[in-house]
């Protein structure tokens, strides 16, 4: 916990934790209690199961079940990564992301496979708080300014249509 205290002390706004949250729910409870609004839990999924230790091991627990268990710790968000799609530039697993986001009560940040502005547009209609775009930014497939514009337009149109 001292490392987290030090990192937040130098100005980091949010900290993402992964495997340790799965291995030690008490630690996560303590962490979220001491640093409310600062802790994000990363859940990496392989065929719906939680992958840990840098994706070298897959747990028997489903990502949704794990997310429901950690909700009581009250993390600020969950980064949900479908590792089968991450970095592949083949598009995200929309059904997996939507299913996950609709079954948990913590804000979800989608990650893994976002390849095009069309992917951004589709995900911006899902019940997700945000998305992480990685390789597609580096390759130039997506311009950040265009992705932001799409998300702002989708949010604005939902608000005008009364769907949020």
What are these regions, as identified by a protein language model?
Residues 2-86:
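Conserved anion-binding
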Residues 22, 113-114, 138:
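Short, surface-exposed acidic/glycine-rich loop or hinge patches that mediate macromolecular interfaces
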Residues 87-89, 117-120, 139-142:
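Short active-site-adjacent structural elements
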């Amino acid at each position: 916990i001292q490392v987290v205290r030090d990192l937040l002390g130098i100005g980091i706004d949010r900290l993402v934790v992964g495997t340790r949250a799965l291995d030690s729910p008490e630690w996560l409870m303590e962490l979220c209690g001491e640093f409310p609004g600062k802790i994000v839990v990363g859940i990496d999924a392989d065929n719906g199961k939680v992958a840990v230790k840098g994706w070298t091991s897959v747990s028997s627990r489903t990502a949704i079940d794990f997310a429901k268990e950690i909700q009581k710790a009250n993390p600020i968000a969950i980064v949900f990564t479908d590792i089968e799609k991450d970095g592949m530039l083949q598009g995200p697993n929309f059904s997996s992301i939507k299913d996950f986001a609709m079954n948990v009560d913590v804000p979800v940040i989608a990650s893994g496979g976002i390849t095009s502005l069309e992917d951004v547009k589709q995900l911006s209609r899902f019940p997700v708080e945000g998305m992480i775009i990685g390789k597609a930014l580096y390759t130039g497939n997506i311009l950040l300014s265009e992705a932001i514009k799409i998300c702002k337009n989708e949010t604005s149109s939902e608000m005008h249509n009364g769907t949020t």
